[in-house]
Amino acid sequence: MEHPSKMEFFQKLGYDREDVLRVLGKLGEGALVNDVLQELIRTGSRPGALEHPAAPRLVPRGSCGVPDSAQRGPGTALEEDFRTLASSLRPIVIDGSNVAMSHGNKETFSCRGIKLAVDWFRDRGHTYIKVFVPSWRKDPPRADTPIREQHVLAELERQAVLVYTPSRKVHGKRLVCYDDRYIVKVAYEQDGVIVSNDNYRDLQSENPEWKWFIEQRLLMFSFVNDRFMPPDDPLGRHGPSLSNFLSRKPKPPEPSWQHCPYGKKCTYGIKCKFYHPERPHHAQLAVADELRAKTGARPGAGAEEQRPPRAPGGSAGARAAPREPFAHSLPPARGSPDLAALRGSFSRLAFSDDLGPLGPPLPVPACSLTPRLGGPDWVSAGGRVPGPLSLPSPESQFSPGDLPPPPGLQLQPRGEHRPRDLHGDLLSPRRPPDDPWARPPRSDRFPGRSVWAEPAWGDGATGGLSVYATEDDEGDARARARIALYSVFPRDQVDRVMAAFPELSDLARLILLVQRCQSAGAPLGKP
């Protein structure tokens, strides 16, 4: 231990700087810690904490009081502290041959290396230190076994630190005992630490308990310019520190306060091993759990429970008026079709020609692309819409307000269960939202005046609609329809149908045509 560290050590124990300097000047700068403490105790110096004795304790007459700490010797408390420190450190067992050869660069048995190792552990406060060396190292050095500073061995032997393992000569040959077995056995019995760069592989195979002990209690070292340096992490970077490795009661590691690299975007929640300063006082929930807690929605709640209630009806002329039981539901105006809603509509469509309870299907008329006035192609006199609803013939002389309900349509009172219009979700948004007799988009019609465009619709909700569809609208409608069909049907079939009907942009009609194209040998015709 160097001079500044020694001074700091003794001042922590409570001694004055002058007393420590006086003792160090008497014993020398290289004096051991134990020798300095003994000299401080012998000369009568005591720590500053003990200079003011405690108040005398009252003892009943005729009884013998237990001697107080102030009534004990001047160095009793210091000895107890030193004894406690020494008892908390593990015993040290040094492989003398390995340490000496390591210091001598594996060429010379350097006894100075053993002294450096012993002094390093003494300065840390270890009291049980044993060094094992073969006894033949006491012999005079020879050319094949060079030894340097052999007097160090005798000095350590006098201090009861060095132990010679037995050896003898038989018929002129030296018989040497296995000193490694001594080292491992003593260290195992004392529950100490082995100081060596040897792995003792042969001894690990002899005893499984020794195998575990050697793996967990072997302390390696290095010499750097006559400086003994054990590693700070004897068992690797994830193992204990050197202080905990040499201590019987290792200190728990300090909690890691490393901040999470993801910060507020971390989704690990309570499973995150890093520190989150933004949530120190409440439970570290996952992001999904925090969102559920804020919105008040329980996990797994269906879409029907979170759907907002329908707004109550207003005046007859308002756009938010409640629809009639046979009114169609329309998508938002000028919006691209939603893929999820489109697939839901496909699941509700009956692609076959069977209309169920609405009546048997009628034969499809021959294909004709002749321009004409009137409604869509799938509306004819006495014909039905290819879906669950039927519309009246556009050639009727009645206005939409005077028309009776079309055949096959059963009106039900408001509020009762009714089948949902399957084609309503797929019609163009250019139709009035509240008119049950609205016409399909104008993009699939040839230019012409229709009776459906008369101003007899009542509230004038469609007064701003143009009779003729522009080319831009027609191109946008066909492009949206093509994209929607690509997501469901093969591209070649969609392209074939779109090429056969260049003027058709109604998504519902295109779906039926693609379905017919998919059937084997079915000719393309108007649905």
From Swiss-Prot:
Belongs to the ZC3H12 family. Keywords: Chromosomal rearrangement, Cytoplasm, Endonuclease, Hydrolase, Magnesium, Metal-binding, Nuclease, Nucleus, Zinc, Zinc-finger. Residues 88-243 form the RNase NYN domain. Its EC number is 3.1.-.-. CDD domains: PIN_Zc3h12-like. A zinc finger (C3H1-type) spans 248-279. It comes from the Eukaryota. One of its GO terms (molecular function) is zinc ion binding. Its cofactor is Mg(2+). It is linked to A chromosomal aberration involving ZC3H12D may be the cause of the transformation of follicular lymphoma (FL) to diffuse large B-cell lymphoma (DLBCL). Translocation t(2;6)(p12;q25) with IGK. Resulting protein may not be expressed. GO terms for cellular component: cytoplasm; cytoplasmic ribonucleoprotein granule; nucleoplasm; nucleus; P-body. Residues 259-356 are annotated as: Necessary for interaction with ZC3H12A. Induction: By prolonged exposure to bacterial lipopolysaccharides (LPS) in acute monocytic leukemia cell line THP-1 cells. Interacts with ZC3H12A. Disulfide bonds: none annotated. Gene3D superfamilies: 3.40.50.11980. Changing residue 95 to N: Inhibits interleukin IL6 mRNA instability. Residues 48-75, 234-258, 296-339, 378-457 are annotated as: Disordered. This is Probable ribonuclease ZC3H12D. InterPro entries: Rege-1_UBA-like, RNase_Zc3h12_NYN, ZC3H12/N4BP1_RNase_Reg, Znf_CCCH. One of its GO terms (biological process) is negative regulation of cell growth.
